[in-house]
Amino acid sequence: IGKINDKPYEVFTGKSEDFYLPPYVESGWVTKKKKKGERTQYDFEFDDKQGYRIVLPALSRSFEQEFWNYAKLISGVLRHGMPLTYVMDLISNLTVPEDNINTWKNGVVRALKRYIPDGTIAVEKICPECREETVVYEDGCLICKSCGHTKCT
């Protein structure tokens, strides 16, 4: 997730068998390169365990085009100020080939949830326990303010 002023601004994501990151890498940087008359190139950089900068060039060629294009669309929506709860709802409603807990779209939604301020009202959510429309985000989880119901532990 790329941020400006601590708010999500763009998403770099896709599905790939060829994009390998060592397990110790928890963060890195995306750099943008634009040569006149050519397409923009995004590289991923991180520091290895010895502190050396490692560059994985051309992220867009590393990922399946369909998912890279989804990421570009999501980034455009974020840049134009759509509230995160609506962005997450949009992503959740995408139709992708697989639909289980570890899908690409669920991963993107989980990553974005971290940036929702506590107390933000959930989009069109009714509590399954008490049927009230008092569901809000707290620590990235949905919780009902009326009865306390949550799926997070």
Question: What is each PLM-predicted segment?
Answer:
Residues 1-153:
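Long, C-terminal-biased catalytic regions of enzyme "large/alpha" subunits
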